Amino acid sequence: MERIKKRLVAIAAFCLMTTMVFAQGGHTVKGVVADEMGPVVGASVFEKGNVTNGTTTDFDGRFTLTVQNPNTTLVFSYIGLQTKEVALAGRTNISVNLEEDSELLEDVIVIGYGTVKKNDLTGSVAAVKADQLNKGVVTSPTDLLKGKSAGVVLTSGDGAPGSSATIRVRGGSSLKASNDPLIVIDGLPVSNDGISGTSSALSSINPSDIESFTVLKDASATAIYGSRASNGVIMITTKKGSKFDTGKPHVDVDFTSSISQNTKYVDVLNASELKALMEKTYGQASEAYGLLTDSDTDWQREIFQLAQTYEANASIRGSVGGKHNYMPYRVSLGYLNQGGTLKTSKMSRETLSANLTPTLMDEHLTISLNAKLMNMDTRFANTSAISQAVQYDPTKPVYDEHGLNGYSWWNYGRGTYDIANCNTMANQNPMALLNDKNDRSNAKRFIGNAQFDYKIHGFEDLRLNLNLGLDHTSSLGTVDVAPNTEQSFHNTKQSGSGYHTNYNQQHTDKTLEAYADYSHDFGKAFIDLMGGYSWQHFYTESFNEQYKADGTQPTASDYYLSTPLTNKTEYFLVSFFGRANFSYDNRYMITATLRRDGTSRFANNKWGLFPSVALGWNIKNEGFLRDSDALSALKLRLSYGQTGQQDLQAGDYPTLATYTMNTNQSYYVFGNQWFHPLRPDGYNADLKWETTTTWNVGLDYGFAGGRIYGSIDAYKRFTKDLLNYTPVAAGANLTNYLDANIGDLENEGVEFEINAIPVETRDWNWTVGFNVAYNKTTVTRLTTDDERPDYYGVTTGGISGGTGNTIQVHQTGQSPYSFFVYQQVYDTNGKPIEGMYVDRNGDGTINDGDKYCYQKAAPDFTYGFNTSLSFKNWTLAASAHANVGNYVYNNIASNGDLLTDLATNGFVNNRYRTAEEHNFTNFAQYFSDMYVQNASFLKLDNVTLSYRFGLKGRHSLSVFGTVQNIACLTTYKGIDPEIYSGIDNNMYPRPRTYMLGLKYNF
């Protein structure tokens, strides 16, 4: 397996080095390069002592090279194979066999502040290489990882262009603070926070520039990043040039085109069904029935469309310089134009990536210069149209020449086009919502770092490393709603004036990190010591204003709908860290790390200490197993560690006394002048780190010469000092509720991964990968008095329907985001009885005391599957993932089930198809457990078929077709069961996508 992986990497990184012929004459040599599996494609062939005169082998392993001296020596090299020198001795035709290089074949894994051989790993770490990543329409790098690693759950964003995925590594470790993993790109920790005008921070990175991912899961691997790593670390390595890329540059270009369509719609009544229900409920002679018209409009199909996406990427890589002083380089350009299936939504993105890696001072100084730039333009659709399309009367037409701005609308029949004639309690025309709102943004991002790595002359075991980084994002946007439109009438504050919004935001992270690393082999013993310092500054500035769009003068007192506001905030993080690795005889390993973090966010508890230790036993290298042919790897791992959390989602000053300027609704008059006074905010000076302690035990295994390999891990995590929003005694602070460290959380799970190569021949290759993970999270403490009978926990999970209703709760002894509902009572036919719930506490009254925790949003088990089958130049690849044990509250059904709302307040609501069957006429059953539905699913994510043309020389052409989001097996009754929050309401559907593409290399 290691051979195959290295071969694929080499073809991508080193193939087709250009022939440089010194003169018109000379001695021409032809030949073929092979290994035990056959011809070697992309092997480097050059004249010894003259690296500029070289070539590479073609797809048949053949080469042609002209030299001046017929007795010169040729050098043959290929990643994963031993370099070989062959004296020509006047020959014009030679055959060369290259042998496996076991040292080069050893995988090197990127970890925090360094790399480590895979065999020396002691922590729970998953590495995913470029050839293993997902295919299809991928706008964010993290989508490439879906289903690839056990315990790493990526819930794709909705179907909006550029939408982001929610990432959870082993379920998260907090309730109120961030549960996002730390993202590190080319050694630089970057912000995963979105800013105004962008749907995803990471969508600014071109996925085609990604070389590999490394996921750090347990605390022994993540503790080196301290307070930013409680939820795991995802390390992204981008593609770079290589010192072997000599000669003419190598160019890669690719182009893809795709069409996306929605395949499923909410099951509501059509026009004829609604008329029949209205007649049955009210009668044809009723005023309610008279509200209907004669159109037959499928509103969901009206607002959605076929969406086209185009993407093009081009890159150039090579290397300049000599043998010991050289500079590999890679520069890439990318363009993406993605249309949305919801009309008016679209996104375009341009990216530039440059990687320079000069190596100087006789290979003692290596400088890594990485820069990534992005420009993104987005048109956001008004997603309120999605929920309105479900509820709007299908007997009404889309357009009406006598309607408001040409659209049909609910009005009182007064013949005017003003707010007095608008039924502001009614639903709104979905197409008007889309077309009467113009929401656009432009975002730019720069991520760059310069890393200097110096091996001390005369003492090469000691390396000094300096990393300087900058992550800067800026955005500006406008939102326009024209005056005298339906949605401007429905806004009480606007009263038909419409509005114009301007906003801009910038976010800047600066990083300085320096460390020293000493490593040395002492015979059988190996030691690696590292210590360093980190300084990080995080700064955010934003501006927002909104004013009337009806021509009101700026000097008017009611011109501004929201006061222009500029906000600036910053914080600092200073750290000291160290790591010690020791191994003996490639059998026994120990790793210890220590990090001390200081944050400006905490007033009285600035510093936190985060240690870890891990042990590894390479059982395969023991004498009793060393000669086993069946067993290729067996390593036992045990680790313990602590990480912290200071990203509390409470701003940068939750522990400091701050003041806020009053709004227009709460200003005061002094004399004859109005003033906006400052009011003090509540704060808790004693807030401190959330601390997560993790135990992990793991086993890495391999059989049949590495053709079957994988890992098993079990872990348990304890988070203490959990942040919770808790009541404050009257007069004790400047607020009624305050953030405090009074909660605890437990998290446990098991992960299993297996990969296999069932077939590996010259013409056939078949790989299969499967992973499964179990995770359980339990809240163990929320307040200092959890046993109070009137304390049900922290409510969360707002829903549509009613006012301020929530459907989820954090409760001691239960999973976070459990559904907090009544137990529905059914008749003998299994039909729910309206307004009747089980009196669970037996007090004779139905109230909050009868609610109970029923299921949760998070799955118990997650699965991932991928396979690739190659025959000669054909490759067929597929991937799938599944969740089991996750539940979803179907808010669309709970909103559309009440028949009383069929006709109300002078307008008609469309109903969910179960409304007539349930026949709820008096009570909305928002809190019934019947709407909490099993959302377990199996999704076939994509299937790709590709063909590679065997062009001569250095040219390569591949064509491929992909179908994405192919099928979903589930019992859930909504559109899509994969909803991270667990609440299904107003979701932009994920479309099915058909894609064609080509790749050309020369």
Regions found by a protein language model. Give the residues of each.
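Short, small/polar-rich motifs associated with maturation and membrane association
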Residues: 1-361, 365-374, 382, 447-448, ...
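Short, solvent-exposed loop/turn motifs
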Residues: 39, 82-85, 189-190, 364, ...
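Short aromatic-centered micro-motifs
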Residues: 76, 183, 582, 840, ...
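Extracellular/periplasmic, surface-exposed regions of secreted and cell-surface proteins
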Residues: 133, 180, 210, 290, ...
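Conserved small-residue
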Residues: 252-293, 740, 757-857, 971
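Short Gly/aromatic-enriched secondary-structure transition segments
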Residues: 267-269, 481-483, 546-548, 785-786, ...
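Extracytoplasmic gating/loop element in the C-terminal half of outer-membrane beta-barrel translocons
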Residues: 431, 599, 828-831, 881-964
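Glycine-rich, aromatic-lined ligand/substrate-binding cores of catalytic
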Residues: 857-888
